[in-house]
């Protein structure tokens, strides 16, 4: 059986760095998207139908499941999209169920950052990007469109949900290991294989 891993983010937990690493690593068949805030970069195997279906932007199951044809037996198959972990467009549970419908035995990977650090990161980002963003972080969190961000920080709810899945492994990575540059060893343990890395392509160094 060909293994498939789903990297869920979380947002503001080095997701773009992970996606760049997955994209350039020779041992990984990367089927995801790099969201780097400047522009999206797609892997050549990227399947927009799968991502849109799982995010509940459409109901085209037959198109979405064609992504299975892009799996490789001799590589680590990996899909990444941090929106799968959020409740934007649809509740995160519904998104995960759509993923499982296509990949019943997939393994999930999530990187969790301290909630306060995550909020500060979102706030700093929005201050740079959006004119009129409140400088006061309490006022910032009271904005209507920040309900999704606040919900995202309910890690306990999400962890409890994933633990109840019977056929799917759930790997949690502490964001601190990324900061300590220990992430390659963690990923190798999850994938159960040595990852080929070149200095120029190892964005974690």
Residue ranges and their predicted role:
Residues 66-69, 73, 94, 164, ...:
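Intrinsic low-complexity, intrinsically disordered segments enriched in polar/basic residues
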Residues 90-198:
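PAPS-dependent sulfotransferase catalytic domain
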Residues 1-85, 106, 184-205:
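PAPS-dependent sulfotransferase catalytic core
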Residues 2, 28, 172-174, 197-202:
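A broadly tuned "polar low-complexity/structure-edge" signature
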Residues 9, 32, 132, 201-202:
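Residue-identity detector for glycine
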């Amino acid at each position: 059986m060909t293994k498939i891993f789903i990297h869920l983010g979380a947002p503001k937990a080095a997701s773009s760095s992970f996606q760049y690493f997955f994209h350039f690593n020779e041992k990984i068949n990367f089927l995801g998207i790099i969201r780097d805030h400047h522009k999206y970069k797609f892997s050549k195997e990227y399947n927009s139908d799968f991502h849109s279906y799982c995010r509940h932007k459409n109901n085209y199951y037959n198109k979405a499941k064609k992504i299975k044809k892009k799996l490789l037996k001799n590589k680590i198959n990996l899909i990444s999209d941090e929106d799968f972990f959020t409740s934007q467009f649809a509740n995160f549970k519904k998104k995960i169920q759509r993923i499982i419908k296509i990949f019943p035995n997939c393994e999930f990977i999530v990187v969790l950052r301290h909630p306060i650090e995550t909020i500060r990161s979102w706030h700093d980002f929005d201050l740079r990007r959006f004119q009129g963003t409140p400088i006061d972080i309490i006022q910032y969190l009271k904005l209507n469109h920040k309900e999704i961000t606040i919900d995202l920080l309910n890690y306990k709810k999400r962890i409890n949900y994933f633990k109840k899945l019977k056929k799917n492994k759930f790997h949690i990575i502490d964001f601190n290991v990324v900061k300590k540059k220990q992430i390659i060893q963690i990923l190798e343990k999850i994938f159960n294989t040595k990852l080929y890395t070149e200095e120029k392509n190892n964005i974690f160094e």
